[in-house]
Amino acid sequence: MSIQNLNTFDPFADAIKGADYDVQDGLVHIRIQQRNGRKTLTTVQGLSAEYDLKKIVRACKKEFACNGTVIEHPEYGEVLQLQGDQRENICQWLTKSGLAKPEQLKVHGF
């Protein structure tokens, strides 16, 4: 009898599956990553390079009362990281601020 629940979960795995999930496809991918215990990270990938991501993170931190940063991912470029489950908040905020249309947002996670 083997234990099947010890597999690792890669939140970026579905972005690697096919060529249609390219950074240039116009989609903004919003993912959630499990850290330790109840702690989670929300990552946002695919925002246009013309936006200053540090200013976006600063506004999100103030709006959602959470911590955040911009990390440089080797495959996906600059990715926003926010602490906590901010998937719904970031979707509403991106559409309200005009940074992305609702049909451009693709939410991944549990």
Swiss-Prot record:
Coiled coil: none annotated. It comes from the Eukaryota. One of its GO terms (molecular function) is RNA binding. One of its GO terms (cellular component) is eukaryotic 43S preinitiation complex. It comes from Anopheles gambiae. GO terms for biological process: regulation of translation. Keywords: Protein biosynthesis, Translation regulation. Pfam families: SUI1. This is Eukaryotic translation initiation factor eIF1. PROSITE patterns: SUI1 (PS50296). CDD domains: eIF1_SUI1. Belongs to the SUI1 family. InterPro entries: SUI1, SUI1_dom_sf, SUI1_euk. Probably involved in translation.
